[in-house]
Amino acid sequence: IRHWATVMSVESDQGEIFFKAVAPESISEIALTEKLAEWYPDDMLQLIAIDAKNGWLLMRDAGEQLRSLIRPTKDIKPWVPVIQRYAELQIGLSEHLDEMLNTGIPDRRLASLPLIYTELLADKESLMLGQEKGLSSDEFLKCQALESQFEQVCADLAAVGIPESLNHGDFHDANVLVKDGRITFFDWGDADITHPFVSLRTFFVSIEMSLDLDEYVFTPEMAELLDIYLKPFEKYAPKDDLFRAYDLSKPVSSIVKTIAWKESITQMDEIMRPEYAWIVPELLREFFYHMDALS
């Protein structure tokens, strides 16, 4: 049971059945999940029933979490077919932008992000200015100073020519199921439309946690997974341009994640909000790191 969703399971004569009830602010997950299952039934959970009005999903079991294969062994090879298939899905889903946006998921495409960033800086409460774990006045000034540079980063990333698509929003090893060679992607409650490479942020953070790595460490095995992910996108740009696009996507992904958390925290009650409020300023510090790395 979480603020954003409740999940329960029960055994049946047809195997384990899962029920999910999402919070009102995540109601778009229901319609999106239904659409994804319609377009890519072999890659998504099999739905038994949905109730879009109440935010309910009833789903069949699709195997064990990818995490159960990775964390005990510290072997990230099980990610190989997953990250390749995820890239293929993103490319295919780029043809369904209007339909996905019509489900109500957030529009965080590159053209809109500079304004969203400016609006974020106006929300002093979310930035926790001058508070413990919040932004200092110097950090806030740095945020302001980076506005025009961030706008240019978004423009440069768009210029590479990779179509925007679905970003899972929480693409880690507990949100992928595997069973008899079948890969299932699920839990689309944090999804939005933005640059596809934004998904790589949480993907690599998940690997950092699996391997007990320090932040921003990039191992040869992680580089291999990046190569595998980028390969399908070579239809849009040369490999060197794709690597440059990945670097440009890093500060963008920090801002997309910041906005997602800010909107989620705003919906929390006064008891729960302090537990998560620090995440917004911390993600902005991550943004600083990636912007500095580009200069």
Residue locations for each model-derived region?
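Protein kinase glycine-rich loop
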Residues: I1
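Active-site acidic catalytic loop and adjacent metal/ATP-binding pocket
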Residues: W4-D13, F19, S148-L200
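A glycine-centered beta->alpha junction motif in the catalytic cores
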Residues: M59-D75, I91-E95, T118-E132, S206-M209, ...
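All-alpha amphipathic helical-bundle segments outside canonical DNA-binding/catalytic cores
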Residues: G104, R108, P238-P251
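Active-site activation/catalytic loop segments of kinase-like enzymes and analogous catalytic loops
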Residues: P196-Y236, P251-I271, L283
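Regulatory N- and C-terminal appendages and interdomain linkers associated
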Residues: E263-S295
